């Protein structure tokens, strides 16, 4: 495979998740309402992960070499320390922690924080840096985005594909793997008409429908909040299916609108936060 084809191959994956989940509010009033922090709402996983107006913070960490010099008792106690911190903030943020050690060069673990109020996520991450493991790790990458309601592949604009997306439910085993890919579009994309972008999204969504039973996906918008436009988040138990998804999208020409795809692409495994820290303490 040539360098160019490899590049095109990588740039094409996010078409589906952007096609199926790229969103913006339909009016300024709706946008303002969607973005209002819902401070009075209790954090419930099944709710916050399906709502618009939710901020997502992804922070990748690399443990320092001196971590191995920390006394074993302190390293073992770090898991309980992080568990207590998560419990302290459970009414303000939803915390997921993933293990990347052994799969990535530049990180050992990363957080995904979902919050109605971005400042609450910032407070959690600031306090994490004061924990035993937080004081012995350096930030490699931070990505910030927000969820929005469907815009392109919606019932009114693309009813056929919307029905296909709605009926394609994940049916595989509990996902063991997580992949995070940041994406940035070029000026040509943003200067296209909404109708032109809709057409592109329909073309790119079609070949992905067969893989939605194997791959979960979620989209965060980050234009103006970060140096990228989208954060694409995937969960799967079948990395071969995920690879085949990429191969199917390699034939789609939408990658000409990307100026960033990955850099980094982060692959990790899914565990409880406590188990991630325990694994790093060994």
UniProtKB/Swiss-Prot annotation:
Keyword annotations: Calcium, Heme, Iron, Metal-binding, Oxidoreductase, Periplasm, Signal
GO terms for MF: chlorite O2-lyase activity; heme binding; metal ion binding
GO cellular component, one term: periplasmic space
UniProt: heme binding residues: 204
Name of the top EC class for this enzyme: oxidoreductase
The organism's place on the tree of life at top rank: Bacteria
Entries under InterPro entries matching the protein: ChdC/CLD, Dimeric_a/b-barrel
Protein name in the entry: Chlorite dismutase
Organism from which the protein derives: Dechloromonas aromatica (strain RCB)
